Amino acid sequence: MSDSWQTYKDNSEPFSPPENNQWITVEGVIPPNTTPILKRRYISNKCLSTHNTAGGAIYHTPRHQGDDVNISVNPTTGYFKEKIPLQGGGWCQWHINTIVFVIMYTDVNHLIKDAVPYTGTGITIYINDSEKPKEMKKFTNYINYKPIIYPFLRKDYDTPNQIGLYGESGGTTSFGLSLIPGSEWKITYMPTLDETKMPKIIVSENPPGIYPRGNARVEYPDGKIDLNRDSIDYWKINNTSQWE
């Protein structure tokens, strides 16, 4: 079956989760001055994409499609709760593959005046048999993740100060989630934001004619400095053991 025919059928009978479905609950509480982003990605083993190897051989891979989910957050408590359908329906028979939940700052002036929000942190959940990183924790039916996260400052010589959020894995922490039919499925994400500790990535300008133009270092809350790097070690923020 050609790619164009599959695309035609997908457009004529598009992604449309059936009402008679199973659902994954995503809930939690986000800190003040942050906003959530919830993404869901579906996979189809019926609709395939065609590829060619360098030697001319043809092979096929599953198609993917995803979208953002509008989230309603309680403005007082920060609580949110959304449901993600297991099946996406449509001619392609979409089913859930990954769920990504990220929080980002909306305002950082309480930390540094005139700084701007930067990157966020959160979780990436790989459902059932989806391709996943080798090194990650795996759960069945339920994930309850309550990390401590921190603000971090990125100070570049040629851009305004930027403040992002940093978690255990930097951006998103990955988990595998196996779903047993007939069980309740839930993902709970309740981070604690500790704004008393803020590591800094500082990129200063080298003299003209010296490459690279920027010279980076990382400064930690306890005064430690890592030279010639622009990435943060999470365990150093709170001055704990790397293996805790």
Identify the residue ranges that each predicted region occupies.
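Beta-strand-rich domain onsets/edges
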Residues: S4-T25, P32-N33, R40, R229-I232, ...
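Short, surface-exposed loop and linker segments with low hydrophobicity and enrichment for Pro/Ser/Thr
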Residues: F15-P17, N21, V29-P31, Q87-N97
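Residues at beta-strand starts and edge strands
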Residues: N20-I24, T34-P36, G78, N97, ...
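Intrinsically disordered, low-complexity boundary segments flanking structured domains
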Residues: V26-E27, V69, T172-G176
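A structural detector for beta-sheet-dominated domains
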Residues: E27-P31, R41, S72-T76, K83-Q87, ...
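Structured domain cores in non-transmembrane regions
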Residues: P36-P151
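A eukaryote-biased signal for long
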Residues: G122-E244
